[in-house]
Structures are given as structure tokens and as C-alpha cells.
């Protein structure tokens, strides 16, 4: 596929301008996987295609549900065409189950505690500062988003969480938490952007942590071996296959 100029490159993707349409961009999914703000990095052959397939399935489902996203099409497993937008430097996290960083920051909360409604947190995208948590008031004060936009980020992220939670629940899988990002399109409207793949959530089949299917398996490895990376690849393949059902109903 023809590509325009490279706009940016991260640990798991490259973003290019679209060669024929200035309102679009092209995302190429890479085979990289990382943890600890990039302190741990590896290559898993085929991961880019699996992550791209999962992301395309998720965004297709969200688009069909009427959620405003940047997703246009996925002509190839590693390629995604999106509406070009200016990213908001925030990670928006909804949590149904207390686990991961939440219980490290809140040791008084037992792992497995259920939040109803889902608990909302914002984190500033800043690898050098390890993506610090940021309050809605600080988001507004720093000019990252307006108060109205913060409310929209909260409501839309919860809507996305509930849609994905329902899709996983149909397969007896618990969505523990979900991290998404937003951008502003050419009109200034907020849209769900970036990617939503197996790096974006924690999912526990049957609600059992020991059966987790997500990136946490990679994070938890004391030593990363070739066999371990193959185990992770198989999990990403299973998740991509499971999300195929979301668009083939």
C-alpha cells in the first residue's frame, strides 16, 4: 500500500499521512511488545497482524454501535486507515475489577473488588514520568481539555467499556479494565482513536485471573524466553479469533 510521510512512530505502530487524502492517516501495526514504559521490549513475529485484526474488530463493533471513532477501514491485517486527528495526551481507564496498578496504588483495596459503576481514572501520557495519574481539574487547568470535553471523555469511555464488556461477557470472559485514547478530528469533535487491542485491557475467562488472555502474561514473566513469547503470541491469536465473532454476528 502506498504511504505518505511518516508522522510518528511508537513502540507498537507507525502512523503515516495518507498519500491521496489529507483528512486520513494510515496506521501500520508493528510486531513489537513492551512493558514498563519500554524498559522491557521484544519482537513477536505476527503480533502486528493479530493486534491489527483485534483493533479492526473492536472499532468495527463500536462504529456499528454508533460510537464516534477514527476507524475507516483495515485493508490488510497490519494496516488501518483512520480519520486524521490530533491526539489528546491522556489514557482514559475504566476499571470493573480492582487489579494491576490500582491495587498497588490502593493497598487497602482487595484485588478482585468489583466497581459498579466502573471506576474512571485519567493518566497523562508521559513515559519519562511513567504516565502519572491526573485529575479532571488538572486536565482543565493545564489546557489539555475543556471541562465539557472531560465530561465527554468520561461518558464516552464508559460507553465503550460497557459495549466491550458485554461482548466479552457473551463468551464468559470478564473485562477487568480498559485503557483507551481520544483525539480531535478536523471539526474539533472528540473521537475514540489510537488502537484497542490485547494491550489495552485485562480479560479473565470465567473471572479467573490465572486464565488471563492479555498482555499481563508478558508483564508477569520474570524472564522472557522464546517459549514465553510464543505463549504470548498464541494468546493474541486466540483473542483476535474471539473478537472475529463481534463483527460476524
From Swiss-Prot:
| A GO biological-process term | 'de novo' IMP biosynthetic process
Q: Which domain of life is it from?
A: Bacteria
Name the keywords, alphabetized. Answer: ATP-binding, Ligase, Nucleotide-binding, Purine biosynthesis
The reply to whether Ligase figures as a keyword in the UniProt entry is: yes
| Catalytic reaction(s) noted | 5-amino-1-(5-phospho-D-ribosyl)imidazole-4-carboxylate + L-aspartate + ATP = (2S)-2-[5-amino-1-(5-phospho-beta-D-ribosyl)imidazole-4-carboxamido]succinate + ADP + phosphate + 2 H(+)
Q: What is its EC number?
A: 6.3.2.6
- Pathway annotation: Purine metabolism; IMP biosynthesis via de novo pathway; 5-amino-1-(5-phospho-D-ribosyl)imidazole-4-carboxamide from 5-amino-1-(5-phospho-D-ribosyl)imidazole-4-carboxylate: step 1/2
Q: Which GO terms describe its molecular function?
A: ATP binding; phosphoribosylaminoimidazolesuccinocarboxamide synthase activity
Known Pfam families for this protein?
SAICAR_synt
Q: List the InterPro entries.
A: SAICAR_synt/ADE2_N (IPR028923), SAICAR_synthetase (IPR050089), SAICAR_synthetase_CS (IPR018236)
Q: Hey, which family's this protein in?
A: Belongs to the SAICAR synthetase family.
Protein's name according to its UniProt entry:
Phosphoribosylaminoimidazole-succinocarboxamide synthase
Taxonomic lineage from the root: Bacteria, Bacillati, Chloroflexota, Chloroflexia, Chloroflexales
Amino acid at each position: 500500500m502506498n504511504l505518505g510521510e511518516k508522522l510518528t512512530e511508537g513502540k507498537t505502530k507507525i502512523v503515516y499521512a495518507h498519500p491521496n487524502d489529507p483528512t486520513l492517516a494510515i496506521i501500520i501495526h508493528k510486531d513489537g511488545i513492551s512493558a514498563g514504559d519500554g524498559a522491557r521490549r521484544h519482537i513477536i513475529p505476527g503480533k502486528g497482524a493479530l493486534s491489527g485484526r483485534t483493533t479492526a474488530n473492536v472499532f468495527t463493533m463500536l462504529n456499528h454501535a454508533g460510537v464516534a471513532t477514527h476507524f475507516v477501514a483495515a485493508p490488510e491485517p497490519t494496516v488501518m486507515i483512520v480519520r486524521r486527528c490530533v491526539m489528546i495526551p491522556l489514557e482514559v481507564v475504566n476499571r470493573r475489577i480492582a487489579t494491576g496498578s490500582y491495587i498497588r496504588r490502593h493497598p487497602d483495596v482487595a484485588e478482585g473488588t468489583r466497581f459498579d459503576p466502573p471506576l474512571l481514572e485519567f493518566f497523562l501520557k508521559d513515559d519519562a514520568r511513567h504516565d502519572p495519574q491526573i485529575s479532571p481539574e488538572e486536565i482543565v487547568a493545564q489546557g489539555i481539555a475543556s471541562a465539557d470535553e472531560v465530561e465527554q471523555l468520561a461518558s464516552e469511555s464508559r460507553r465503550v467499556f460497557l459495549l466491550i464488556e458485554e461482548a466479552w461477557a457473551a463468551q464468559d470472559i470478564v473485562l477487568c479494565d480498559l485503557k483507551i485514547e481520544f483525539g480531535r478530528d478536523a471539526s474539533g469533535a472528540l473521537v475514540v482513536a489510537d488502537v484497542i487491542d490485547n494491550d489495552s485491557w485485562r480479560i479473565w475467562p470465567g473471572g479467573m485471573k490465572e486464565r488471563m488472555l492479555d498482555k499481563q502474561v508478558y508483564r508477569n514473566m520474570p524472564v522472557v524466553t522464546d517459549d514465553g513469547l510464543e505463549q504470548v503470541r498464541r494468546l493474541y491469536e486466540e483473542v483476535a479469533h474471539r473478537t472475529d465473532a463481534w463483527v460476524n454476528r
